[in-house]
């Protein structure tokens, strides 16, 4: 029974719950970024480049057996070595967009939550004491 109580204490700590919420929101955010990339950005890139699906971009490194279609999936299935760089391009674009969006979010949050409060106004009595001090210094010199 003590094991269950210890687990309950562990699971209900603020850090664990915050982490769980972060993972869930992160997974959902990843889907949003995937949609942003695949549905909005990649079609614009395709309009410029002329190709929408980068996952099938590859360089064939050896001759294929006779009768094998020249597609990435078929060449891999036939055991032909290929340099498949297209999927990497797509994943790299996803990462860069995700990193940029996270940067913008963190930047916005840090601006909203200003950790340095503005300096307090100097009290009137302190200003008066400074004037007296400065006056005494000037008389002594």
From Swiss-Prot:
Any single Pfam family the record assigns to this protein: MscL
Membrane topology, as annotated = Multi-pass membrane protein
The subcellular location is:
Cell inner membrane
Q: What name is this protein filed under?
A: Large-conductance mechanosensitive channel
State if Transmembrane is listed as a keyword.
yes
Parts of the chain that traverse the membrane:
16-36, 86-106
Cross-referenced NCBIfam families, in alphabetical order? mscL (TIGR00220), PRK13952.1 (NF010557)
